[in-house]
Each structure stands twice: as structure tokens, then as C-alpha cells.
Regions:
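Phosphate-backbone binding and catalysis cores of DNA-processing enzymes
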Residues: 1-123, 127-133, 230-291
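Conserved short loop/turn motifs at secondary-structure junctions
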Residues: 46-49, 131-140, 149-155, 178-187, ...
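Basic, low-complexity terminal or inter-domain segments flanking catalytic cores
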Residues: 70-72, 159-160, 164, 181-499
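Short glycine-/polar-rich loops that comprise or flank the Walker A/P-loop
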Residues: 172-173, 388
Length: 499
């Protein structure tokens, strides 16, 4: 029908101009900023080259900021009031309600005393019991980045490894197009998935009953599908021989996508949540427990559920007013540093980069464009950071190298280079070009002005840097590369990348 209703090409010329302007601007920033920083750093004795980019540099800086926060984190002790509660039918634990943290033990003891209670054993009573039936829907279908994040979490595969495995499954006509940014499908996809439910269940080796037979907005929403729908299995299910030809990661990814798709048709996970409030003098303790009532879709993820098991206790049967023996305790704990990025959590951070900026307009634009990078490019950006030796992976955690740290310190004062805000500012105006409300020439002129600003500011920024950590690291690397002494001149013989 599209070919029967062809539109004049000039109707879409502004979109071409928008994309062309973005490409020119990226090129201008990269071709000027990269040699500018490289040459200025080389003048200070730093070897190697440094490349910068609108997406690459803010991504590196995200990891750098997180690493700095971890390295500079100072643990602080705090105290909380907890309770071990014993009733006729069993025992359970409770936490102070509302939760409070105390900086010192003395502060906690004074608080407990002010509530006519004490640390240690004393009598209490069950003040309230509430039980509600709750449900949990099956997980959303996968976009590329959500699948990459999940596979990294479960199997420690890198984003690029997942994309490569996905590409193979797509070319084998087993999974849909991988480079998609939406977790939704249309009613057409829902219909064929429903028709092939039996084949997918058979592949999983389970006799499953389809319960959710009507499309639900959580998964099926044509208005949220543009070029490509969520990642789902095709009508073709692999044979035993086809499965045997797949590598291990491909088998795991295919099974994960099939399970997530099949789960959409299974019953919800149902459970009872019970909240017990226990009163000791004027102290109130809350205890929460969950009792599964219907396993539903979780039957597909039993192993995964075991690994991700919530720390939720099973509560005994109690009645309001029941007597309880309560052991009130002072629990000493420590504040915890932020967690280092993995490739999976970094992908999520790139997609939700709006959370790292303060400007409301920038936040709005970043939400619209879904952060920095695209579904198709984020994996290659992370891979590029590794290849350029800005970051390395240690036990699945992303760590910034001394070279990466030096670059981040060098660009630190140039907010537009380190923040996702540049993407927001660009996209705001680029969208205007696409709507014929903006001018390509004006935009490129502003980019050139920014480059002139960099030419003036960067040499001063480099002058202020402390190179001691970088030089120390380089000296250690140089020592490791020494393989012996030259018998003729007595100088060190060193291993280099090439001869």
C-alpha cells in the first residue's frame, strides 16, 4: 500500500537535513577535539592518541564518575532498632516502623528509652495484621538494550557478544530483528505468537496451558511500535540439529526470549502479602511476609528465581491482641558505596541518561530520544572504549584505566563534552530542522563557535592537570615489559606491541 501512495521526496527533505546536520556536527567535534586533546597531552609527555565523541565521552565520564564515587566513599556506621518476635505459632523478625537511622548507639538508646522500652527481652502484643492478595505480571518483552542487560546479568556476556549472537539467530530466521528500541508488539505479532504457542511450549519441554488469550497493553501497543517491534521468536522453531549447531550463548538467548514471550500467555504470579505490626510499649515493629498462591509464569524461570530470591520471611499465623515475647536489639550497620557499572547496568544508564542532568528541558529531550546512543550503537560504543584502553572489564565490572582517567580529568571542565546535555541541546535544535523550524547553517555555525572555545580553553585545562598517577602507572608497565639487559650496550631490552 505504501508504493500505491507514494509521496513527493521533498516532503521528507527536512529529515534528511536533520540527519545530515547531526552527522556533520559529530564529525566536526570528533575531528577537532580528538587531535586537540591528543596534541596538548603529548606536549606533557603523555603517549598515545585520545579520541572524543558526543556519545563516547559522556559514556566514559559516567563510568569515571561512578568509579570516583566508589573510591572516595567513606563508610559511616549507623544503628537501627530491630526485633526478634516469638508467638505461639512460631517466630519472626521485625523492623522499627517508621524506619529510623541513628548515628550513635547512645542516640538509639535514648530513643528507645523515650518510648518506655529497653534493649533486650520484654513483652509485646500483636497490634495489627493485614493480608492482601497481590499479583505480578510476567516481564516485559525485550528491546535490544534490555536483553543485553539481562544477558550480562545472567551469563556475564558483553553487549557486543549478545548483539553478535542475536544477529546470528536473526539471520537463521529464529528471532525477530535485534536492533529494536521498544518492548512492545502489535496485534499482528500477538496473533502469530498465540497461534504458535504450542510449538514454543514444546521447545521448552513443558505442557503449558494458554490462559492470557487477549492482548494486554503491557505487551501489545501498536502506537509504541515504529520501525521494529520487540524481540520475539519467529514462527520457525529450531530442530535438535539446528540447536546443536548454535553456540552456548545463542542457545541461552533463544531460550530466554522464548520463555519471556511464552510467559505473556501464562497466568499471573499470585501471592499473599501479610503485614504484622507488633507493639512493645510505644515502639512499633513491622514484619512483612509473602506466601505464593499461584506460580503462574514463574514456572518458566525457576532456576533464575532461586538465584534472585528475595529476602522475604514466612510469617506464622497470628491474631490481633496476641501476646508476644520480643527481643529488642540495636543493630550496627554501615553505609554502602555505589555499585560499579557492569555492561548491563551501563546500557541502562545510557538509556536513562536524563537522570544525570539537571536542566528540565534537557531531561525532557533525553527522555524522548531515550538517552545517549541508540539501541544499535551502544554496544559498539562500550566496545570502542575497551579497544581504546579507556576502560577494562574486571570480574564483569567496568573499570576506568589510568589513560581513561586522564582523559576524563582533561575534559572535566568542558561540561558539554562530559554531559548527556550536549545530546539534549543538539536534539532540541535538530528536531526543529526536521520540522522546517530550524536552519542547518545556524546550527553548524554554533558548533564551530564551540570548537573555537575549545581551542582557546583546552591548553589551559591541560596545564592544571596532575600527571603523577598516570606517569606512575606507565613506569610500572615499563618495568613489566623489561625482559633483560642488552649484552652489548647494557640498556634494557623491552617488549613492544610491534617491532
Amino acid at each position: 500500500s505504501g508504493f500505491q501512495n507514494l509521496q513527493p521526496g521533498m516532503n521528507y527533505y527536512p529529515f534528511y537535513q536533520e540527519a545530515q546536520t547531526r552527522q556533520i556536527a559529530d564529525w566536526l567535534i570528533g575531528m577537532n577535539a580528538s587531535p586537540l586533546y591528543t596534541l596538548n597531552l603529548q606536549q606533557k609527555g603523555v603517549q598515545g592518541t585520545f579520541s572524543l565523541g558526543r556519545v563516547q565521552t559522556p559514556t566514559l565520564y559516567l563510568i569515571f564518575q561512578r568509579q570516583e564515587a566508589i573510591e572516595n566513599f567513606k563508610k559511616e556506621p549507623f544503628f537501627e532498632v530491630e526485633a526478634s518476635i516469638k508467638v505461639n505459632q512460631g517466630s519472626f523478625k521485625g523492623v522499627l516502623s517508621p524506619t529510623q537511622r541513628f548515628k550513635t548507639q547512645e542516640e538509639l538508646l535514648a530513643f528507645v528509652s523515650s518510648k518506655q522500652a529497653k534493649i533486650g527481652n520484654q513483652e509485646g502484643r500483636i497490634a495489627d495484621v493485614q493480608t492482601k492478595e497481590k499479583k505480578t505480571n510476567s516481564p516485559s518483552l525485550f528491546s535490544l538494550s534490555s536483553l543485553q542487560s539481562k544477558v550480562n546479568q545472567l551469563y556475564k556476556a558483553t553487549a557486543s557478544q549478545t548483539l553478535k549472537a542475536m544477529q546470528g539467530l536473526y539471520e537463521a530466521k529464529l528471532l525477530s530483528y535485534p536492533r529494536t528500541d521498544t518492548p512492545f508488539i502489535t496485534e499482528n505479532e500477538f496473533a502469530y505468537l498465540k497461534a504458535n504457542f504450542g510449538k514454543y511450549s514444546g521447545f521448552l519441554g513443558l505442557d503449558l496451558e494458554m490462559v492470557q488469550t487477549e492482548p494486554r497493553k503491557r505487551y501489545v501497543d501498536g502506537s509504541k511500535v515504529q520501525e521494529h517491534h520487540a524481540i520475539i521468536p519467529t514462527k520457525q522453531v529450531p530442530t535438535e540439529s539446528a540447536l546443536a549447531k548454535m553456540d552456548d550463548l545463542q542457545r541461552k538467548i533463544y531460550a530466554l526470549v522464548v520463555k519471556t514471550t511464552v510467559a505473556m500467555f501464562l497466568p499471573d504470579y499470585l501471592y499473599e502479602e501479610t503485614k504484622i505490626q507488633t507493639k512493645v510499649a510505644d515502639l512499633l515493629f513491622q514484619s512483612i511476609g509473602k506466601t505464593p498462591k499461584q506460580e503462574g509464569w514463574k514456572i518458566l524461570f525457576k532456576q533464575q528465581t532461586k538465584e534472585e530470591k528475595e529476602d522475604v520471611q514466612t510469617l506464622p499465623l497470628v491474631i490481633i491482641g496476641e501476646h508476644a515475647e520480643v527481643d529488642v536489639k540495636s543493630a550496627e550497620k554501615e553505609t554502602q558505596p555505589p555499585k560499579a557499572f557492569t555492561e548491563g547496568t551501563l546500557l541502562t544508564a545510557m538509556k536513562t541518561a536524563n537522570k544525570t542532568v539537571d536542566d528540565e528541558e534537557a531531561i525532557k529531550i533525553l527522555q524522548e530520544v531515550e538517552g545517549i546512543g541508540t539501541e544499535a550503537t551502544r554496544a559498539s560504543i562500550i566496545e570502542a572504549l575497551k579497544q581504546k584502553e579507556y576502560i577494562q572489564v574486571i570480574k564483569n565490572k567496568l573499570v576506568v584505566t589510568e589513560k581513561g582517567k586522564l582523559l576524563c580529568q582533561a575534559v572535566e571542565s568542558q561540561h558539554l563534552l562530559t554531559s548527556a546535555e550536549m545530546t539534549a541541546k543538539w536534539e532540541t535544535y535538530l528536531k526543529k530542522i526536521g520540522k522546517r523550524e530550524g536552519n542547518q547553517e545556524n546550527f553548524i555555525t554554533n558548533i564551530k563557535k564551540f570548537i573555537v572555545h575549545l581551542l582557546e580553553a583546552v591548553p589551559n585545562d591541560i596545564e592544571k592537570l596532575n600527571f603523577s598517577d598516570y606517569q606512575e602507572q606507565k613506569e610500572k608497565e615499563a618495568e613489566k615489559s623489561i625482559v633483560g639487559k642488552c649484552p652489548k650496550c647494557g640498556n634494557n631490552i623491552v617488549l613492544k606491541k610491534s617491532f
